[in-house]
């Protein structure tokens, strides 16, 4: 259920409307499940780099006020198509909560950028407990396998909930087939593109 709206400085002043309703709402909202004691931050717009710092400071202050444990999520490019690794990072004293999870420590030095990076940075600077999860995913297509791995190995155990991920497997097959069709069309288009090439001498 809708719990609160974010009116942080730097966010675009736009109105979001939905199907089957006449009302509008702000683009960045917080939804709550009181029974499970869960909060979800949803944004219908991209947060621009110029607004990320202001937004992160605004939201992090609210996290501290309500004593929430934020879970930040970002993606990194898959190393192969066979595995989906999930890596964990933490701020404050939350690192110990990663020990019992099926997530790896990052195998190399890296940077979390964008709005998620700004949120993690603000949590660290304010000594706020938070967990960050970096999941291997496709940079070009929706990746249900990555979503499934993230939910089952990170979100479910931390939040103590169960999520039905069967639909994600079905979507993974659909997306895989769509990717193959797209690759075939791209190859066919490439074969037909304009080009110049030598054909040998003739008289």
Residue ranges and their predicted role:
Residues 1-66, 125:
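N-terminal catalytic or cofactor-binding beta/alpha core of small enzyme domains
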Residues 51, 55, 59, 115, ...:
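General structural feature for long, well-ordered alpha-helical segments within catalytic domains
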Residues 41-42, 72-75, 134:
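Short beta-strand segments
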Residues 3, 10, 15-17, 161-203:
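Haloarchaeal acidic low-complexity proteome signature biased toward cell-envelope/secretome components but also
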Residues 46-96:
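Internal, conserved structured core segments that host functional sites
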Residues 60-69, 125-129, 156-163:
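Secondary-structure boundary elements
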Residues 80-156:
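Catalytic cores of processing enzymes, dominated by hydrolases/peptidases
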Residues 47, 51, 111, 142, ...:
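Catalytic cores of large soluble enzymes that bind and process phosphate-bearing ligands
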């Amino acid at each position: 259920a809708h719990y609160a709206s974010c009116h942080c400085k730097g966010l675009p002043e736009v109105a979001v409307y939905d199907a089957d309703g006449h009302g509008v709402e702000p683009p960045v909202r917080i939804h709550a499940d009181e029974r499970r004691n869960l909060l979800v931050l949803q944004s219908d717009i991209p947060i621009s780099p110029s607004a990320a710092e202001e937004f992160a400071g605004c939201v992090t202050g609210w996290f501290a006020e309500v004593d929430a444990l934020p879970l930040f999520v970002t993606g990194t490019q898959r190393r192969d198509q066979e595995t989906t690794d999930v890596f964990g990072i933490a701020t404050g004293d939350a690192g110990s909560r990663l020990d019992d999870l099926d997530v790896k420590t990052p195998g190399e030095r890296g940077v979390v950028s964008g709005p998620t990076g700004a949120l993690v940075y603000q949590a660290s600077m304010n000594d706020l407990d938070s967990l960050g999860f970096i999941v291997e995913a496709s940079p070009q297509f929706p990746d249900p396998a990555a979503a499934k791995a993230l939910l089952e190995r990170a979100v479910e155990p931390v939040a103590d909930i169960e999520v039905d991920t069967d639909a994600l497997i079905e979507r993974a097959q659909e997306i895989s087939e769509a990717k193959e069709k797209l690759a075939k069309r791209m190859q066919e288009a490439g074969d037909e593109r304009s080009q110049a090439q030598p054909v040998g001498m003739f008289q």
